[in-house]
Design a protein with these regions (language model features):
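Catalytic cores and adjacent flexible loops of soluble metabolic enzymes
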Residues: 1-340
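Structural beta-sheet core signal
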Residues: 8, 79, 130, 191, ...
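Structural motif
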Residues: 80-84, 107, 358-362, 399-402, ...
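Short glycine/serine/threonine-rich phosphate/pyrophosphate-binding segments
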Residues: 111-114, 198-202, 364-367, 451-456
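Glycine-rich anion-binding loop/nest that anchors nucleotide
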Residues: 191-193, 216-223, 356-364, 386, ...
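N-terminal donor/sugar-recognition subdomains of glycan-related enzymes
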Residues: 327-379, 390-394, 406-409
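Acidic/Gly/His-enriched mid-domain segments of enzyme catalytic cores or analogous surface patches
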Residues: 374-463, 467
């Protein structure tokens, strides 16, 4: 049986702004992992930015020394660099007081450059580990060719990385098996999982069972799965699995103490873990920033989120082109209609009328007396936005949200109230409903490009309306 090692990457993976753990928590974490007998402790990132005390995003290895005053014999202390984002002018010669090894991750287009960079790190006395970003994004031939170069370079470790949490067991076994077949046995084989499909721990355990029987391996994990988006394999679960099924070596109580203290404090300022949006990202091996952006900008159903991500090609899924996402969002929902006659009819209806746009903010109830007095005095035509607003005589209701439109069947509305909908509304549309083109009302680049109130204002502009009154936009 080969040597089996556990690497904890909590201090680097945490979704905390600027990795600002606080100095005391960093001390607690490193000491606790040492006491738990974790083999490899990742202390954080090395980056070009000036170091801020309390962060685990370091500029120089000297910044890490205060946390490693009592390095434990037999443990390896590491940091990670993202190729191209760390200038080696900041890296001092190795003197044993700080980290022992540096992990270098790289993207597909950097595959021909990374080993030269790694050689410069090793020339300063550090052990080096190398790992792809998104192993699934490489062809087998590319991986084999790179591993042959890795064998010549002889780093401490080479890792397979499931960057987007998209690997099922057969995928993990394929890529780690490929690496196992071609990677020299005197180089550690590693595996780093993300939990988008809730498979990080299962895949890590399967990897351990398959590979540790015949070679030295390392598996990455973080306490309570702490990591960006869906998180990672769980250090405590993997440690318990190794204790139970392979070798009794890790102190689970020490890990639990860290979760109760340091991880609990992190949960007060951030969150991570499985969610449907991250599940969707995992299905398509897509960057989670894509789903985060769509959710940030739009109130969108999960099935529609999936449909939009599916429109991205394999390259686009790995990037986060926000302008492209907005374009695809509109295209996905757009259902073009010939609306020239509808616009002409609306234009004639709105001509020379005072128009009040009535949104469903709290003030429409709180200030009802004043608003109704205004309506009576100005003899306004009232157009409600995305809702049946009770207590008012509505001339029109404008809908651009399918959910809101479907709710109207459960709301009381005067039969004379007319309805305007945009063409993105899904499902059956009632007769005598005016339908206008959704995409014609969109202006790209705006933060709230599909806000119902903004779409209605654009419709009124298209109908030649030069001015409107507005009420109820508070808290909306």
């Amino acid at each position: 049986m080969g040597r089996l090692q556990l690497l904890d990457c909590t201090l680097r993976e945490a979704p905390i702004d600027n990795l600002m753990w606080g100095e005391m928590n960093i001390h607690k974490m490193i000491h606790g992992l040492e006491m738990a007998n974790v083999d490899i402790i990742e202390c954080g990132f090395l980056k070009n930015a000036d170091y801020i005390k309390g962060s685990t995003s370091f500029q120089r290895v000297e910044d890490i020394i205060p946390f490693l005053k009592n390095k434990k014999k037999g443990k390896t202390y590491v940091a990670l660099v993202d190729y191209g984002r760390y200038d080696l002018k900041y890296l001092s010669e190795y003197d044993g007081r700080s980290i022992d090894a540096i992990r270098v991750c790289f993207k597909k287009n950097e595959i021909g450059l990374v080993l030269d960079y790694a050689a410069q790190i090793r020339a300063k006395g550090y052990q080096v580990c190398v790992q792809h970003v998104d192993t699934m994004g490489f062809f087998d031939e590319e991986i084999i060719d790179f591993i042959e170069k890795v064998n010549e370079f002889k780093p401490l470790a080479y890792s397979v990385v499931d960057t987007f949490g998209a690997m099922y067991e057969e995928d993990m076994l394929h890529y780690t098996g490929l690496a196992d077949q071609y990677l020299s046995k005197d180089i550690l084989l590693g595996f780093h999982a993300h939990n988008n499909l809730m498979l990080a721990d299962a895949n890590a355990q399967s990897y351990i069972n398959k590979m540790s029987a015949h070679r030295d391996v390392v598996v990455d994990a973080s306490l309570f799965g702490c990591g960006r988006s869906a998180g990672n394999a769980h250090t405590e679960l993997i440690a318990q699995f190794i204790n139970k099924k392979h070798e009794e070596k890790y102190n689970i109580d020490e890990l639990l103490d860290l979760i109760d203290t340091v991880i609990a404090s992190a949960q007060e300022v951030t969150s991570w873990g499985y969610s449907i949006p991250y599940f969707i990202a995992g299905i398509y091996n897509a960057h989670t920033f894509n789903v985060k952006q769509l959710l940030k900008r739009h109130n969108i159903k999960s099935k529609d989120l999936r449909g939009i991500i599916e429109l991205l090609d394999d390259v686009q899924k790995k990037k986060y082109d926000y302008a492209l996402l907005e374009k695809l969002y509109v295209e996905y929902f757009d259902n073009p209609v010939a609306d020239a006659l509808a616009l002409e009819k609306l234009s004639n209806t709105f001509k020379n009328r005072n128009i009040l746009l009535l949104a469903p903010g709290k003030s429409v109830a709180a200030e009802k007396e004043h608003i109704q007095k205004f309506i009576d005095e100005k003899k306004t035509m009232v157009i409600a936005v995305n809702n049946v607003i009770s207590g008012y005589q509505l001339d029109y209701i404008f809908y651009s949200s399918t959910n809101r439109y479907n709710l109207r069947k459960f709301q009381e509305c005067a039969p004379e109230t007319k309805v305007i909908v945009t063409s993105n509304i899904q499902g059956a549309i009632e007769e005598d409903t005016t339908v206008v083109n959704y995409s014609s009302l969109i202006k790209f680049g705006w933060v709230n490009l599909d806000s119902s109130a903004i779409l209605l204002l654009r419709l009124l502009i298209r109908c030649g309306v030069e001015g409107v009154y507005v009420a109820g936009l508070d808290g909306y």
